[in-house]
From Swiss-Prot:
Its EC number is 2.7.7.77. This is Molybdenum cofactor guanylyltransferase. GO terms for molecular function: GTP binding; metal ion binding; molybdenum cofactor guanylyltransferase activity. It comes from Brucella abortus (strain 2308). The keyword Iron does not apply.
């Protein structure tokens, strides 16, 4: 693992790693357990996410709707989803926004994206300062990544209302409802890889895990 760059000064920011999902596609492919706890080099996948994000934020915690004891080894607070009739990733986002509310800004990421840019926070914060937008989402290869974003914590009432009435229970549609800006992040390179890779590459399938191990080995070279 390689640590991220220090956060930029002048902005208090909380980070949240959202460890949602059932890992069903990974398990259907014959790999048991949570995808974010699969070994990647010398550490689990989520440990790489922590190493990338922790230097970029003031505080960092993990969010999950499952058994929080799974995260005891990582030395971070773990926060369980708020109990709601509604389900899905928006509940995780609401939980994170509410937990982070003493801070003005929340940076979110999924737990299965081990190659996050080391300057992610600074790029998103800079865009927020330029535009004043309450939501800034990461984008790469012409694809928006709604789970990777910078959120103003005053969005809690908006999201609570959205969850009461929304027909489309996705983070993207909530962000579209509020309005968001994007930061385009270029593809990344490693000396021993023939092709560039997406820094927001996430692990869902056994083949994804194999590819992640290839990228990780190249980065450690």
């Amino acid at each position: 693992m390689r640590a991220g760059q220090p956060k930029i000064t002048g902005a208090k920011i909380t980070g949240a790693i959202i460890a949602g999902g059932q890992s069903s596609r990974m398990q259907a492919g014959g790999v048991s357990g949570d995808k974010f706890l699969q070994p990647l080099g010398s550490a689990p996948v989520i440990a790489h996410v922590i190493a990338r994000l922790q230097p970029q934020v003031d505080t960092l915690f993990i969010n999950s709707k499952g058994d929080l004891s799974r995260f005891a080894a990582f030395g971070l607070p773990a926060v369980k989803d708020i109990a709601m009739n509604h389900g899905g990733p928006l509940v995780g986002l609401l939980t994170c926004l509410a937990h982070a509310s003493p801070c003005r800004l929340l940076l979110t990421s999924a737990a299965d994206t081990p190659f996050l840019p080391c300057d992610l926070a600074s790029n998103l914060i800079r865009k927020q300062a330029e535009t004043g937008a309450r939501i800034i989402l990461a984008c790469s290869n012409e694809r928006v990544h709604p789970i990777v974003g910078l959120w103003h914590t005053d969005l809690v009432p908006d999201l609570e209302k959205w969850l009461q009435h929304a027909e489309k229970a996705s983070i993207f549609w909530f962000a579209k409802h509020i309005g968001f800006e994007v930061v385009n992040i270029p593809l990344a390179h490693a000396p021993r890889l023939a092709e560039s890779y997406d820094p927001f590459f996430n692990i869902n399938l056994p083949d994804d895990l194999l590819k992640a191990r290839e990228i990780n080995e190249a980065l450690q070279a």
